Amino acid sequence: MSNPVSINNSGSISNSNLNNESLSPSRLSSSPNSKSMELNGKRTLKSSVVKTLLNRSSSGNNLNNTVTTRRAAGSFTSNYQNIYTPNNNSYNSSNNNNNNNNDDDTVSVDGDNPPDSPKSTKDHSNSVGSNSGGGGGGSSGGLNMSMNNIKQQQQDNLIKQQQKDRSLWTVRSLKEHAEVLDIMERLKPVNRAISFGQIYAREETQFDFDPLIGRDTMLQLILQHLQFEGLMDSRKLLEEEARVQYPEYAINESRLVTLLRTALKDSERVFQLTLDDKKRDSQQQLEEHLAFLGLFKDETATDIMGEDVNIYDEPENSNIIYVDDKEKEKEKEKEKEKEKDKFGPNSTNSLSGSGSSPNIPSGMNNNSSSIGNNSIGNSNSYSNGELSPLSASTLLMMSPQNKNSIETNKPQVKAASLNKLVILLTPDNNHDLEYTKTFLLTYQSFTTPEMLLEKLVQRYHVPQKPGQSLDDWKKSAVPIQLRVANVIRTWIKDYFSDFNDKLIQNVKSLYENMKQSGNMSHAKILSESLNAKIKGMVGMDDQKRAPTFTSPAPEPKVPKNIWSQTLDIFSVDEEEIARQLTLMDFEIFSAIKSTELLNQSWNKPKLRHRSPNVLTLINRFNEISQWTATSILSYPKVKDRARIMAKFIKIAEYCMRHLNNFNTSMAILSGLNASSVHRLKFTKEELPKHTQQVYTELQFHLSSAQAYKEYRALLAKANPPCLPYLGVYLTDLTFFEEGNPDFIQGFINFGKRKLIYGSISNVQSFQNAKYNLQPVYQITKLLKGFKLLEENDLYSRSMSFEPRNKERSEIL
């Protein structure tokens, strides 16, 4: 066993064994000429300590003092404090009992406290006196056991870490932490975690069959839909396979489609969950910003003033705002000035006759009216100044109906509570038909069908005032009750799609109540109108709407090769193509319901299902525009392109001049003004002079300048039948919706609803007059089956046919 060397406070060596005196740290540090030796000694001592730890940690031989081991961050460290044991020799520094002298008494390999032995460590090595008494062997044996245990524990921990199951860690962690799962599903509902719905869904009840709509009911709905669509063979085949019998019902609609529309209407907010994250986040930020500014309007909110107040508890002379006379006079003067400026005698030119050329503004010849860039689908893109709409009052004054209403001396309602609007809807005298039409068309923008029926029921039950005789009460109540019954009848007749099963039952309860009260005439009004709709009976008014013509339709201009498979657009006369296009487009236009034009449904993804026919006409417009450009760019030679371009110009001219079909004319002009066609300079120069003049006139009269001023003037002069350009109405409706508040001083802005009704009623007036034309199946099929090229392909062809900086002689 080696003899320890003890170093006292004065730095002298107390042991007589000086064989390794030259290696003593105290000697190295005390010698004035030993700086280089000190550095070498530090490196040697430090490396020796590390080697000793690695080579001898398992045996513990020649380690006479306690080794302090620590475990940090998954590893252990052996701290040798004041100990050095190379070559069976140990240098031990004594540890004084006085803690204040510890810093001076401790011998450090580095001349300071070693990194592995901080000053705060309380586990110092023992002094020479305590270790020299033959206890070294026991200490070494204890150290061996301690080191082996630590090593074994470290190996066990390493094995456990390696064997830990890391598969599906996300799923398992979310199961263990439900709050994290809840937050994730709230932030990203597109994950569609079913558990989120299960947490907040109502308690499930197990049924052997569906209590709401079972298999038989579903089959009956499908069979009724097939019956309604005229698919009799499919219906019979389904009956045989399903072994069910379909009792024929006289229902003038598909109940399956009606139920699906109702479901879509009830679940419109669900659409937001299907939006992509970026779009949804931007929409949420916009709504939060608008809410902060106090401008956000929840489309599902129906908290309208007066909904929770009985209609007869409403104060008589309050909660209504009228348009004052001064405001009306000022508005009239402004409109007269605008009429002089915009619709003067020299502002428009007659389209009859092609000899006189219109006064075309400078620059109009070479610049299209940007119709190609402002397609019908983007009708609200007027922020650039080109499509700045006319004022609301100007647009209303263009309609003869609204002109008459403005010129009357009746007080005009500007805003009112819901109760007041219902009272005006059902007056005891002086019934206003235009007000009824406006209200029933637009009421869903400020209340619900259920609330409206509830208010009408309240209005029907006229209370008897204190001291009022029965005869006097009847004189005042009967006219109001009759008006309520007539309003409900009109509502059912014109807007039966507003009624779901619950609402129909409420109407039935109302006329049962009328019967019990002895008002048989009122009950008959409701029962007949409701039964007529349910059973699909056609009323007298619907029969009057059937087209009747006093003269026969003109003879179609059928080409000789009408039955040939080589039939193409060049084989058919331009006039007949214009007729068939008009019939096809007017069929879509006449199918548009007034409700499809409300709330900008065509422009909002989650409401698009409300406007199927509007979207169909928009798509049809864009198809004709694309077809025009594709047809022109299908020919590589200039003369061929000029020939097909001239044909389309003639078709557009005939549609506008002779058929008053402005929608199809605008679609063709949009294709001619597409960037891929508009740049074809040599093709346009190849057109005949007369065709170039017609093209210029088309651009002028259908220009979007000054909110389509020239087009509006043509439309005002046009005699029915007429197919207007739908994009203008969509622009106006967007302007009315976004440019006017829904409420004024907390009351419903009914003036805004009048503007909307005025525009929609104009559309309805054009739907009533049908075209007396004969369809030709072969030509219609040809016009439906054209091929379309994408915008990029069209522009690539345009650049290859007429490259930039090329002369006419270099072009085919």
UniProtKB/Swiss-Prot annotation:
Residues 1-146, 320-382 are annotated as: Disordered. GO terms for cellular component: plasma membrane. Promotes the exchange of Ras-bound GDP by GTP. Residues 573-804 form the Ras-GEF domain. One of its GO terms (biological process) is Ras protein signal transduction. Residues 214-246 form the LisH domain. It comes from Dictyostelium discoideum (Social amoeba). Residues 323-343 have a biased composition (Basic and acidic residues). Residues 409-535 form the N-terminal Ras-GEF domain. The keyword Lipid biosynthesis does not apply. It holds the Pfam family RasGEF. Residues 1-36, 53-65, 87-101, 344-382 have a biased composition (Low complexity). SMART domains: RasGEF, RasGEFN. Keywords: Guanine-nucleotide releasing factor. GO terms for molecular function: guanyl-nucleotide exchange factor activity. The keyword Repeat does not apply. Residues 131-141 have a biased composition (Gly residues). Residues 75-86 have a biased composition (Polar residues). The lineage of its organism: Eukaryota, Amoebozoa, Evosea, Eumycetozoa, Dictyostelia. This is Ras guanine nucleotide exchange factor J. It comes from the Eukaryota.
